[in-house]
Amino acid sequence: MSRRCELTGKAVQVGHLVSHSNRKTKCRFLPNLCNVTLQSDTLNRRVRLRVTAHALRSVEHRGGLDAFLVKAREIELSQTARLLKREIEKKIAEPATPAAA
């Protein structure tokens, strides 16, 4: 399992820790990944994803998983998130069935 957010694409970064004497040591900066279950209102089911804490805040800010995925770019999403986005867009595009009169 890669250390990459499924919604934002944020991954491990490599850099230096710099001491007071300016000595540099190589370091890996890991994303704050959380295993979460998010509710899709359009599909009416729950989805398990591995996302960063930043992505969770972004999902809440945009108004839920469905709104986040509709606005998200395909490049940033993981394969499972892309499939989920396509399902949501297909469900939204379906015409509402008229009520029986």
Swiss-Prot record:
Q: Specify the protein name.
A: Large ribosomal subunit protein bL28
Organism of origin is Methylorubrum extorquens (strain PA1)
Q: Which GO terms describe its biological process?
A: translation
* One Gene Ontology term, aspect cellular component: cytosolic large ribosomal subunit
Q: Which domain of life is it from?
A: Bacteria
InterPro entries attached to this UniProt entry: Ribosomal_bL28, Ribosomal_bL28/bL31-like_sf, Ribosomal_bL28_bact-type, Ribosomal_bL28_sf
Question: Signal sequence: where?
Answer: none
Single GO term (MF) = structural constituent of ribosome
Keyword tags? Ribonucleoprotein, Ribosomal protein
Q: Which SUPFAM superfamilies match?
A: L28p-like
Identify its protein family: Belongs to the bacterial ribosomal protein bL28 family.
Matching entries from HAMAP family are given as: Ribosomal_bL28
